[in-house]
Amino acid sequence: MKVTFVGHATVLLEGSRNVLIDPFFNGNPVAAMKMEDLPEIDYIIVTHGHGDHIGDTIELAKKFGSIVISNFEIGLYLQKKGLDKVHTMHIGGRYDFGDIKVKLTPAVHGSAIVEDGEVIYGGNPAGVIVEMDHRKVYHAGDTGLTKDMELLSNEYIDLALVPIGGNYTMDIDDAFIATKMISPKMVVPIHYNTWPLIQADPQEFCSKVSEIDIKCRVLKPGESVEI
């Protein structure tokens, strides 16, 4: 499986199917890929309703005919926006789509959708585990540190994508603790240096992770890793 860090929290998984997580392109100052450069997208996963995560879901799902996976409330919102291939889930649920398996995991954050100045309830935020081609990728979404992450060690994660930017999510210290609890084979930091409020040094994070014998890769926007 090829995992590409598009920028911010947007990640592309390419294998037997193509999966796009939190597709934020328009307005993303660090996005290293344009929407027109994407391959065919089979699945879009939205971890929560904030604009930098739900992003361009509607436009891309209509373009590719993608199945969109999110929580129940966001799913209803997207259906009202004209999407008919929406699969709703909730935290703790796992579903086998035949070619991929998806599980939503707890995240501690918000999930409101803001539209024309109005706040729309977006259910509970989530992280997600995607299983494809005998590999498991965990995308934490936006979250603070939580003891629930200890349970993720039972999932035998191949690659964890964790936010390190602080302010709205875990900072480097908390992301390090999370990584110890998750115990993945490899970790990649995300959700940092997009705006001044979430400045962080990914090399500092990887330096801490090196102490616990877990591989850490800093991916610049547009770079990929094979797992």
Q: Model segments located where?
A:
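Zn-dependent metallo-beta-lactamase
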Residues: 1-20, 25-29, 96-103, 204-212, ...
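Active-site-proximal loop/helix segments of hydrolase catalytic cores
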Residues: 117-180
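Active-site neighborhood of phospho(di)ester-bond hydrolases with catalytic His/Asp-centered motifs
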Residues: 20-23, 41-49, 69-72, 138-141, ...
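Active-site environment of divalent metal-dependent phosphoester hydrolases
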Residues: 27-28, 50-55, 75-78, 93-96, ...
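Short active-site oxyanion
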Residues: 1, 62-67, 135-137
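Pre-active-site segment of Zn-dependent metallo-hydrolases
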Residues: 12-50, 55-62, 73, 110-120, ...
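Binuclear metal-ion centers of metallo-dependent hydrolases, dominated by the metallo-beta-lactamase
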Residues: 79-93, 176, 180-227
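Glycine/small-residue-rich loop that forms an oxyanion/phosphate-binding "nest" at active or ligand-binding sites
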Residues: 55-113
